[in-house]
């Protein structure tokens, strides 16, 4: 059986439908090839911030930026948790306490609120827009992470 992960599905779609819209929100849309590029930029940035299987928290609405960041977390070898911006503060704090995230990604619209809410937390807060402007794709790092993840999975025995 040919095993595929979510990144392989995304990359296959980008090869077949590079200019087709992958996702859209009320203010923007993104093609498959743009989504892969953005996710790889974010993944390259996050690879310097987290270790394999560590969480990345997100504080923003479901959007093109959010999906780019979530795929970026997977490229970095981590996992993601999208915090609902409408949740009560106490609930958000409990989620972060359980996750023990080192980094929280947000967008320009929610950045000030995230800084206010999480000022007492030991968590780095970064705007996804800033990552996309400044970060470059580091293919060698992303390839190493994927290879390590595939090696780990090939040795996994659920029984």
Regions found by a protein language model. Name each.
Residues 1-159:
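Carrier-protein-dependent adenylate-forming modules in NRPS/ANL systems
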């Amino acid at each position: 059986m040919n095993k595929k992960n979510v990144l392989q599905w995304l990359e296959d779609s980008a090869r077949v439908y590079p200019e087709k819209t992958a996702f859209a929100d009320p203010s923007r849309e993104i093609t498959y090839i743009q989504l892969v590029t953005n996710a790889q930029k974010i993944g390259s940035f996050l690879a310097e911030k987290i270790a394999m299987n560590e969480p990345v928290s997100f504080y923003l609405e479901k959007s093109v930026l959010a999906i780019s960041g979530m795929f970026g977390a997977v490229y970095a070898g981590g996992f993601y948790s999208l915090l609902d911006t409408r949740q009560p503060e106490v609930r958000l704090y409990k989620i972060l306490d359980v996750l023990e995230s080192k980094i929280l990604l947000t967008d320009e619209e929610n950045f000030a609120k995230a800084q206010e809410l999480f000022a007492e937390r030991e968590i780095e807060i970064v705007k996804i827009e800033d990552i996309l402007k400044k970060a470059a794709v580091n293919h060698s790092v992303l390839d190493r992470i994927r290879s390590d993840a595939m090696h780990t999975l090939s040795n996994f025995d659920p029984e």
